[in-house]
């Protein structure tokens, strides 16, 4: 924690610098950032799990307490309005006493609807950042999530501070332990549901605390890109295992994927080839490289695998140009990572939020930025047997280039995805996932 505390001072200074700059540009007095409010389930007295506003948790690791507020202007000590109601039904959050508290003027709020008493008196010239625009209107904010402010903050959130990088290393370190436990459970015969329990126990986080719903897919379920069903019964024959799962640390996410074959076979060889390709793609990451170019390079590598493993005939460029590789690899190579799993800023060309769209032939690519130091991205190439996409190839001449017998042989295995979390440095890449122990 000492290292985090050391980095945190510079982190807060950088956030204050960003706020001061955008306030000056937009002639605003300051920002009031709302952690959020509970959401009640329809016709029920139970709330959905609370998720804090990412703009709020960028400043401090208060992740589970709604009705909190930050008042910041880039000059004065930030004010934290911390919610501590009188409540005998629920656990009330303790008054914070961690290393970060010295950087905030902390006020305690006992009734959520009394927050106006703590807010600036000239509220009309302050901007509200948060989800609950109705609350902001009642409080008198005329500027609510202004585009110029949001675009500026989102653009700069892609450049991580040393504090943020350290949090993300720790999120990776935690997730690696979960992945190792899940791998062991798979080879010992566990069901998807049981593997999930092994993972959560190893990372020490609940389903609501991990940054996204884990994908725990055995056999053909691995062909479903966002599979979250968790079957309780083990399959009669165990073939493959795809796990896409992360962990959280102080509000920052890791997002890691591995694929395993139960036995040594052709599918296992395909995993080895994909692992080699993924590491080669990571070696291509450096400041100044366009992320879409890495995505296109991935399609070339997938095309070569289709040829090498007798899944298709033709040549590499032809398979890419005809969209055949997109039927086997339909998603993007990766995305920005940080406070959110699919972090903001991936399409931002500049501080004004100028949008750089994904290439028309690759609409699911989530990042079009030019790589720069201190960005963190996922690298997650894949190859799947997805019948709905492959059936489209059958409808035209492209289907003649597919070896359907090989497709049929691989279909029960579902698919492959391998994903690491990588920091781009000025002179090197830091593959946090591999460095912290998940080497295969």
UniProtKB/Swiss-Prot annotation:
Q: Which reaction does it catalyse?
A: Xaa-L-Pro dipeptide + H2O = an L-alpha-amino acid + L-proline
Source superkingdom:
Bacteria
InterPro entries according to UniProt: Creatin/AminoP/Spt16_N, Creatinase/aminopeptidase-like, PepQ_N, Pept_M24, Peptidase_M24B_aminopep-P_CS, X-Pro_dipept-like, X_Pro_dipept
What are the required cofactors?
Mn(2+)
Q: Does the keyword Metal-binding apply?
A: yes
One GO MF term attached to the UniProt entry: phosphoric triester hydrolase activity
Q: Is Hydrolase included in the keywords of this UniProt record?
A: yes
Ligand binding (Mn(2+) 1): 255, 335, 380, 419
Task: Give the GO biological process terms.
Answer: proteolysis
GO-annotated cellular components: cytosol
Q: What is its EC number?
A: 3.4.13.9
Keywords, comma-separated and alphabetical:
Dipeptidase, Hydrolase, Manganese, Metal-binding, Metalloprotease, Protease
Q: Where Mn(2+) 2 is bound, by residue?
A: 244, 255, 419
Instruction: Say which enzyme class the record assigns.
Output: hydrolase
Cofactor stoichiometry and binding?
Binds 2 manganese ions per subunit.
The similarity comment for this entry is:
Belongs to the peptidase M24B family. Bacterial-type prolidase subfamily.
Role description: Splits dipeptides with a prolyl residue in the C-terminal position.
Question: What is the protein's name according to its record?
Answer: Xaa-Pro dipeptidase
**Organism, scientific name:** Shewanella baltica (strain OS155 / ATCC BAA-1091)
Which gene does this sequence derive from?
A: pepQ
